[in-house]
């Protein structure tokens, strides 16, 4: 690894608006003879038992009395010493060992005074390593990614058709094979940043563009803003590495001199259901706030949740992609995650599951703690909206939209326009932000994936065999039931919707009983049917097909409520697996985190502000110490005008410099002065900062300065008595009589008729949220 002199960012970068299985988090097996003063071998690029692509970056540490010329290194008996070169200081050598065969390999190092060996287990660059069998069908999109047609990997009529090309490189109609795993040759090209602020292809003749911009890196050097971009495929997904490069660089002898030895892993968000290679994002690959300062940027379509939300596959992809980067460029001084929404989720999940193997620090934007626990309350949204819009439509309470928060917890507005109501004023976060997520994630019959590549993917009609649910996308995690559908942890047995509103007197006991008798639940995947209007536009000519709630896939009362609507039980295997797998953020994370978001509550945006504090609460639940996480909010009323991320990068660089210089002090004690809880106005100017600005959210202190400025809301489960953490899929139950004795209903003491009705609605009991959720160990 090249030497590096730490130079924290001195100035704030210019703003640019931007919108594992748990066991595998353990460290790598120790190399033989590692540690102390003996000769040892360290695997730098990955765990020794999780090597991919046939190569690994190794470091051999010499023992006293030995010199570099004394060293011999072999790979399964073949001499590979020439791959190793002395590091600064001369007491170790680093080399990229290639030619590893699939399975176990042995690398041995020998010098005059000692020897060591390490066993390396190699996996295909197409994966998988630990995520389970590959998903099929899997749509290849390499042409869209600028990589050309995928490589032929079978002649069995499975996957995307690959066509012969003519003398001009144009595709003919002749099929020469198929690609199931979507591999592609690696492509390197060069771009430049124009003085107008765009990235453009560098002229092929190497001439200097007249509008070539210059940029100043972290160490103060001003260089041409030229970017080298490498693209290829890893774990079946497309990846890119970008970093500054000199104008006229020889491709065969790449010059990393402008790299500041830091890496940004740029994670992207969105909601995808898999079965596709995804799409490369120009903004993600070419992240100007980082590239302009000399950071290298890693990006993969497999770490973009718009592609899929199986974060075991995502974590595996991140590890493999980081491994490839290290093999090519050496070990960075640190890797910081950047990315919003699902990109923020990935930072929390991968930081939890893999320690510092993917990222050493995190800057999650608009984050949630994870995706899967959002399904708990988002799965309630349309059930409650349907109740208020249809079942209880005559009730004037629900005509005032802000009253809907009594049941949904999430924010509501009497001002925000509603596209499902002729754009009249009045909506909820459930409607404005989450409508459409129910069919996308729960209905196996519906998908928004209409990519044209399906037309040339074989066997014909294979797309129609996919069960389009999040559960099935991650079936290797949740498991598969006897009916062939993935198991689901979603559950609302015993959930008393509107309990807090009942206790406060905002709804009557009669209304509470009516709601819980009629709200219902979701059908099983096997019983669901195709969606109606507006999700299937072809049927919108028939008013009877209008069904924005997906009510056709609900379990409702068969007789208007006399018989209580069925509730849905989460699958016990899925419940155990979702907790054990690492898909749930449990708070087990120790890396530095600057959690930043715009305050978007007034817009009913899905990135609601409570999530930052849910993350903190879970970290506190884990070990009582959340000092590694700081929370920043920037006001976005009336609109988002300032991006605080460049400042977060600057502060994080100072934080990492402290950890590098004083590792014995740990994360919290190395915080720079600005690594504290803060809130900002729309221009990015600080309103307040310090340890008490968010008081009153997770404690009973008077509201802090930022708490007062930026109020948060709840969820359907918190206003049903559930915990702030929001991580209970299936509650443990208590008898209705026990709940009454414990005062769960406040001043309401049900009479005999009401008690009988409660027991009809909840025959197995009601939620006891003083106990941990079912399936959690």
Tell where the protein language model's regions lie, with residue ranges.
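C-terminal His-loop and adjacent cap/lid subdomain of alpha/beta-hydrolase
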Residues: 35-777
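Secretory targeting and sorting signals
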Residues: 2-34
């Amino acid at each position: 690894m090249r030497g590096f002199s730490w130079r924290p960012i001195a100035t704030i970068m210019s703003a640019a608006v931007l919108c594992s299985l748990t066991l595998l988090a353990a460290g790598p097996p120790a190399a033989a003879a590692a540690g102390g003063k003996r000769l040892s071998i360290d695997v730098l690029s990955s765990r020794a038992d999780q090597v991919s692509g046939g190569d690994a970056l190794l470091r051999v540490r010499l023992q006293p009395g030995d010199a570099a010329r004394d060293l011999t290194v072999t790979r399964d008996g073949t001499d590979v010493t020439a791959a190793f070169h002395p590091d600064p200081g001369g007491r170790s050598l680093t080399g990229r060992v290639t030619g590893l065969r699939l399975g176990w390999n042995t690398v041995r190092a020998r010098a005059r005074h000692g020897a060591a060996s390490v066993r390396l287990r190699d996996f295909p660059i197409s994966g998988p390593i630990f995520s389970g069998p590959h998903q099929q069908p899997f749509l290849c999109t390499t042409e869209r990614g600028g990589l050309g047609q995928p490589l032929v990997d079978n002649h069995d009529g499975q996957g995307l058709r690959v066509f012969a090309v003519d003398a001009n490189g144009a595709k003919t109609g002749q099929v020469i094979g198929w690609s199931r795993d979507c591999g592609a040759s690696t492509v390197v090209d060069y771009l430049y940043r124009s003085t107008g602020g765009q990235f453009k292809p560098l002229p092929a003749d190497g001439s200097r563009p007249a509008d070539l911009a210059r940029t100043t890196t972290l160490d103060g050097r001003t260089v041409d803003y030229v970017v080298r971009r490498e693209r290829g495929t890893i774990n079946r997904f497309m990846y890119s590495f970008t970093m500054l490069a000199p104008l006229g660089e020889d491709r065969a002898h790449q010059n990393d001199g402008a790299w500041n030895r830091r890496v940004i892993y740029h994670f992207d968000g969105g909601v995808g259901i898999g079965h596709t290679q995804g799409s490369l994002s120009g903004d993600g690959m070419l992240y100007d706030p980082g590239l302009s300062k000399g950071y290298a940027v890693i990006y993969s379509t497999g770490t973009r949740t718009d592609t899929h939300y199986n974060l075991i596959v995502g974590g595996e992809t991140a590890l493999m992609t980081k491994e490839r980067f290290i093999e090519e460029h050496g070990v960075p001084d640190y890797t910081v995650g950047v990315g919003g929404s699902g990109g923020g989720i990935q930072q929390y999940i991968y930081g939890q599951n893999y320690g510092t193997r993917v990222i050493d620090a995190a800057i999650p934007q608009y984050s949630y703690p994870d995706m899967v626990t959002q399904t708990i309350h988002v799965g309630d949204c349309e059930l409650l909206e349907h109740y208020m819009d249809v079942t209880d439509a005559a009730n004037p309470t629900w005509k005032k939209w802000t009253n809907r928060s009594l049941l949904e917890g999430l924010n509501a507005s009497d001002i925000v326009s509603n596209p499902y109501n002729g754009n009249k004023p009045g909506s909820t976060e459930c409607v404005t932000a989450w409508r459409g997520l129910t069919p996308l994630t729960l209905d196996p019959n519906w998908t928004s994936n209409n990519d044209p590549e399906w037309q040339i993917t074989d066997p014909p009609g294979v797309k129609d065999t996919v069960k389009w649910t999040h559960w099935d996308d991650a079936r290797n995690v949740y498991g598969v039931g006897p009916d062939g559908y993935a198991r689901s942890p979603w559950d609302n047995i015993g959930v008393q919707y509107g309990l807090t509103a009942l206790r406060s007197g905002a709804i009557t006991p009669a209304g509470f009983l009516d709601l819980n008798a009629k709200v219902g639940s979701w059908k099983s995947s096997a019983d669901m049917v195709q969606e109606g209007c507006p999700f299937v536009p072809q049927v919108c000519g028939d008013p009877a097909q209008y069904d924005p709630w997906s009510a056709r896939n609900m379990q409702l009362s068969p007789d208007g409520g006399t018989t209580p609507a069925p509730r849905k039980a989460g699958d016990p295997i899925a419940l155990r697996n979702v907790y054990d797998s690492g898909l749930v953020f449990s708070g087990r994370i120790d890396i530095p985190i600057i959690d930043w978001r715009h305050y978007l509550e007034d817009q009913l945006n899905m990135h609601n502000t409570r999530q930052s504090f849910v993350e903190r609460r879970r970290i506190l639940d884990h070990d009582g110490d959340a000092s590694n996480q700081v929370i920043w909010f920037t006001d976005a009323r009336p609109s988002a005008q300032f991006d605080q991320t460049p400042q977060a990068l600057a502060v994080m660089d100072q934080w990492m410099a402290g950890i590098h210089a004083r590792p014995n002090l740990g994360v919290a004690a190395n915080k720079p002065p600005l690594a504290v809880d803060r809130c900002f106005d729309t221009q990015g100017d600080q309103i307040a900062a310090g340890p008490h600005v968010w008081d009153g959210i997770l404690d009973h202190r008077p509201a802090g300065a930022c708490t007062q400025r930026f109020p948060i809301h709840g969820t359907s489960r918190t206003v049903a008595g559930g915990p702030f953490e929001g991580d209970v899929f299936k509650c443990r139950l208590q008898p209705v009589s026990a709940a009454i004795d414990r005062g769960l209903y406040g001043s309401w003491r049900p009479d005999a008729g009401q008690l009988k009705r409660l027991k009809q609605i909840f025959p197995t009991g009601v939620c006891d949220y003083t106990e941990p959720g079912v399936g959690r160990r």
